[in-house]
Amino acid sequence: MQEKGGFSMVIHVVQPGDSLYRIAQLHSVPLPFLIQQNELHEPYRLTPGQTIVVPQPEKTYIVRRGDTLGSIAAQNGTTVMQLWQNNPQLGGTDRIQPGQMLVLSYGNKLGRFAVNGYAYPSIDLRVLRRTLPYLTYLSVFSVGFDNAGRILPFSAELLVRMARQYQVKPLLVLTTLGEDGQFSGERAHRLLNIPTARAALIENLAQVLAMQGFAGVDIDFEYVPPEDADAYAAFVRSVRERLSPAGYTVFAALAPKTSAAQQGLLYEAHDYAALGSAADRALLMTYEWGYALSAQMEVAP
């Protein structure tokens, strides 16, 4: 599994009278570097209480004429991917100019962690490109299926190709979304209770993953009827048993719960223990606790 490491930084909280020049002087970093790292734009007005990220690099490099990211990486014993991760101002591109300061390394590693990000096929490619260097997985949202277990038509070729270019593992998000764009408990119930449809979906899923270059699947069934909890876990296990020998990773997306006995259609069929053991990994959807359309509350239980 490819994982991402942390880096050292100071978070400067803007005080009355602060300027970018003063902040740069205070923390001994070049002003252009501070501007680039925070993606600030003229006229660079600051507001008290605003936070400015001040990276604390261990080793830097000043770009010379004729340099490329590849040549800089080779000269300094690093990789282009590491340069992208250390220099968000590059936006995942190879655009550099003489005199520009690049961070080669940071001293204190905070640890290692796997990062997943969701994307619609319609995502702004500039946003995707600047984000990919920081991801381990890219979950392409989403694909559905019909009552016979056939995968519905979709196109994710570009996202899969870009993910692979940035050494990110693309995942296909399999959902029970209906034609109205809402999760359908009825669709989940039909699938989980018709053996031929389940078997067909699993085989069709294996074919799609292979044909389109995915590294795995994220199974995201929401509002599953409580009486189908065991059948849902069994389905996820069957998917893993079919896909694991081919090297695919199977994720289960879990609704955020405060207890195993939590009531509600979103939660009751999501048995953490059963789904956790059935899948290779789990994605805890804390973003479904407090979100834009919910009552005012915290973003995770």
Annotated model-derived regions:
Residues 107-199:
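Glycan-recognition patch characteristic of GH18 chitinases/ENGases
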Residues 147-154, 230-233, 238-301:
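Substrate-binding surface in catalytic domains of secreted glycosidases
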Residues 40-57, 94-107:
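Short, structured interface segments
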Residues 118-122, 143, 175-177, 222-224, ...:
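Active-site beta-loop-alpha junctions enriched in small/polar residues
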Residues 6-27, 50-77, 100:
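Primarily a LysM-type cell-wall glycan-binding module
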Residues 114-116, 137, 169-173, 216-218, ...:
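Structural preference for beta-strand elements that scaffold enzyme active sites
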Residues 202-231, 281-295:
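Active-site groove signature of glycoside hydrolases
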Residues 19, 33, 68, 79-137, ...:
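Non-catalytic accessory regions flanking glycosidase/transglycosidase catalytic cores in CAZymes
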